[in-house]
Amino acid sequence: MDIERTMFWAGLLEILFVYLAFQTALARTKESSVGEGTGDLLKKSRVVGNFAEHVPLMLIMMMFLENDGYEGFITILGLLFFICRLGHIYGILYQDGFGPKENPARAIGAMGSWALRAIAGLKCMF
């Protein structure tokens, strides 16, 4: 099984995840040892939780697709997914509001991630 591209994206996403988790841990030492807290800690907790919800299954689908011969597709899919995750993270941490007008980075990051996951899921099925 040749999954070098997926391994690259898995490594890059894991490094980002460790960084986000570390930032959350630092915020937790200032606010609350248990729970999501408020303000900065709440935002950082949501970023880590959301990342953990979206990334693992996407990487599994990417591995299946790459193993099936879609190497070029995986490169593009991984890049777009990484950009969407960065946008979502930026939107939660640095922009206020929820809707597309108030927080475009979060909206584009979330909707882009959903769309890419749906595309990967359909490609796995067919």
Regions found by a protein language model. Name each.
Residues 2-19, 71-79:
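Alpha-helical transmembrane segments
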Residues 10, 41-55:
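A loop-to-helix transmembrane entry motif
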Residues 13-30, 82-92:
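Transmembrane alpha-helical segments that form the membrane-embedded catalytic/substrate-channel core
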Residues 22-46:
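Cytosolic, membrane-interface loops and tails of multi-pass inner-membrane proteins
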Residues 49-62, 113-117:
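Core segments of transmembrane alpha-helices
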Residues 62-84:
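Short alpha-helical packing/oligomerization segments
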Residues 89-115:
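Interfacial loop-to-transmembrane junctions
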Residues 119-126:
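Juxtamembrane boundary at the C-terminal end of a transmembrane helix
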